[in-house]
């Protein structure tokens, strides 16, 4: 499914850019860090095919200023049974914020100029990155690093409002399930998926989350723009994690960069591609 690999790859590069002691502390809870790389997106997979307060919170968080979430996260970590595990998760979450906030304004602009969907643009970015890493975009399960466990859900749930560990666990299982469902390396499965989408009236909203057989030439130049933004998100995330660690241990101010949303913001129309 699109977008997932870009966030995972970004997180790996950020981890390599961090100071060694911080790398080691994250590696001790690597699977939680890897889940954190997907930020609020994991909530989308709770009862994914219908509106629900849990998956709606995923959308709401994308539109809110992130500093509100990260201020709350400080309190959650202070009260956590395993603060090191909670920190590893939130460091991954910071990576998600950095990549989203760097790329989404340009995604919005590309949608306006290029007349392609959000999902299609991000699908093509995932394809580019998978290909660069010598993976077959049609066959690679991009959620293979997600390992649903109740012990992880118990760490994650307090970061969200009125969400239980059981709901987080179900969301994580849903994430893996839907990535497997929409992985379509054969023409037979593709036809079955598209027929099923049409049967339930979801084709228009879902068909472009299935990796297309061939890249869209229109998106190639736009992917280069997003790759540039991706390159900037890696050092940004590393810097924000180090600063957030100081916030946690030394009570320094939260970086002003968190006073942005995960989404496109309000200035995207002024951007030039």
Where are these regions (language model features)?
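N-terminal leader/auxiliary helical segments
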Residues: 1-90, 94-273
């Amino acid at each position: 499914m699109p977008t997932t690999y870009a966030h995972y790859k970004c997180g790996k590069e950020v981890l390599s850019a961090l100071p060694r002691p911080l790398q080691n502390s994250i590696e001790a809870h690597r699977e939680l860090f890897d889940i954190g790389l997907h930020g609020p997106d994991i909530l989308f997979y709770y009862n994914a095919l219908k509106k629900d307060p849990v998956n709606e919170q995923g959308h709401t968080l994308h539109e809110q200023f992130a500093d509100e979430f990260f201020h709350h996260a400080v309190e959650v970590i202070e009260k956590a049974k395993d603060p090191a595990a909670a920190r590893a998760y939130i460091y991954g979450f910071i990576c998600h914020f950095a990549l989203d906030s760097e790329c989404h304004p340009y995604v919005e602009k590309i949608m306006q100029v290029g007349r392609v969907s959000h999902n299609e643009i991000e699908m093509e970015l995932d394809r580019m990155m998978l290909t660069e890493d010598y993976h077959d975009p049609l066959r690679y399960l991009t959620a293979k690093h997600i390992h649903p466990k109740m012990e992880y859900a118990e760490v994650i749930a307090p970061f969200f409002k009125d969400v239980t560990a059981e709901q987080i666990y179900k969301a994580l299982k849903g994430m893996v399930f839907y990535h497997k469902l929409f992985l379509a390396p054969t023409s037979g499965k593709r036809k079955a998926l598209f027929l099923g989408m049409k049967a339930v009236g979801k084709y228009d909203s879902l068909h472009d989350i299935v990796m297309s057989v061939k890249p869209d030439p229109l998106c190639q130049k736009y992917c280069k723009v997003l790759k540039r933004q991706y390159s900037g998100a890696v050092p940004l995330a590393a810097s924000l994690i180090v600063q957030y660690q100081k916030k946690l241990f030394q009570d320094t101010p939260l970086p002003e960069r968190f006073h942005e949303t995960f989404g496109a913001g309000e200035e995207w129309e002024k951007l030039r591609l």
